[in-house]
Amino acid sequence: MSKQFGKVGVLYGGRSAEREVSLMSGKGVHEALLSAGVDAHLFDTGERSLADLAAAGFERVFIALHGRYGEDGTLQGALELLGIPYTGSGPLASSLSMDKIMTKRVWLQHGLPTPAFEVLGGSTELRLVPDRLGLPLILKPPHEGSTVGITKVAGYSDMKAAYELAARFDAEVLAEQFITGRELTVAVLGSGAAARALPVIEIVAPGGNYDYEHKYFSDDTQYFCPADLPADVAADVAAVAERAYAALGCEGWGRVDFILDRENRPWLLEMNTSPGMTGHSLVPMAARAVGMSYADLCVAILAEAACKVRSPARQD
């Protein structure tokens, strides 16, 4: 295994609001790769430079970063320039998927279902937004993950505080129609025609509040994998996940988040191109449901590592 992959860097930590989660993901991936015989080394991009990365002699890297500067296409572009194969999606798909506004626009262009939304700025009359989207609604920063900066707005009086919280992270704020239903997520492995959805997971958090604490630290959240769904509904959700993944040009692996409404219609919420790999994370859970261990999953993701941008032919 060591010879197959050579010297591997596990990129983790970083400088985003999700640094602590990334530290947990990276350590887990590193230990799993070592157990599989891979010559793996941790590399904290929040503490070391691109020059250090270029000099490290990695033959490929596993990106275990979440959020800005790790999941948004910037690092992927740098790795393309350095010629270092990496896991996950390329610069464009990563950038599109990290921007929740652009993600929804792409999905709508492909005829995929996603809740109605508006983009809010400093000049938006906040009191009018609930009249258009209804209440409750969701306000969130477009470029953060792990539920950072998200508020469920129950009434008109909550709009200002919710907007100000989200605006701490982004110049624009995404207001989204709230869909009542079951929270689902689907992991997808592979690229192109070979990309396949893993079993659907249902998430049931206490009080319906699946926030940062419940995602990564709470043992109170319940997960059902595979989700208790009629076979045709599960197949439909998986198919929509694969289409959503393909529409954004995703590669390698990812996770698609949904709400399933009371009529069993799936609504797309977000695309994650570098999902969590912690003890509470969902992609490893889905992999276990098909007999794939955590280490097997890490090796499978690493095996897909590649540079995605084709160099143009030289004109001499």
Curated annotation (Swiss-Prot):
Gene3D superfamilies xrefs: 3.40.50.20, ATP-grasp fold, A domain (3.30.1490.20), ATP-grasp fold, B domain (3.30.470.20)
Residues given in the record as ATP binding sites: 130-185
Main subcellular location of this protein, as a coarse class: cytoplasm
The enzyme's E.C. designation: 6.3.2.4
The reaction(s) this protein catalyses: 2 D-alanine + ATP = D-alanyl-D-alanine + ADP + phosphate + H(+)
Binding site for Mg(2+) 1: 257, 270
A Gene Ontology molecular function term of the record: ATP binding
Locations listed in the record: Cytoplasm
Annotated positions binding Mg(2+) 2: 270, 272
Cellular component terms (Gene Ontology): cytosol
Pfam families associated with the record: Dala_Dala_lig_C (PF07478), Dala_Dala_lig_N (PF01820)
Cofactor(s) listed: Mg(2+); Mn(2+)
Keywords, ordered alphabetically: ATP-binding, Cell shape, Cell wall biogenesis/degradation, Cytoplasm, Ligase, Magnesium, Manganese, Metal-binding, Nucleotide-binding, Peptidoglycan synthesis
InterPro entries: ATP-grasp, ATP_grasp_subdomain_1, D-Ala_lig_Van_CS, D_ala_D_ala, Dala_Dala_lig_C, Dala_Dala_lig_N, PreATP-grasp_dom_sf
Database matches in PANTHER family: D-ALANINE--D-ALANINE LIGASE, D-ALANINE--D-ALANINE LIGASE B
Family classification: Belongs to the D-alanine--D-alanine ligase family.
Name this polypeptide is given: D-alanine--D-alanine ligase
Species for this entry: Bordetella pertussis (strain Tohama I / ATCC BAA-589 / NCTC 13251)
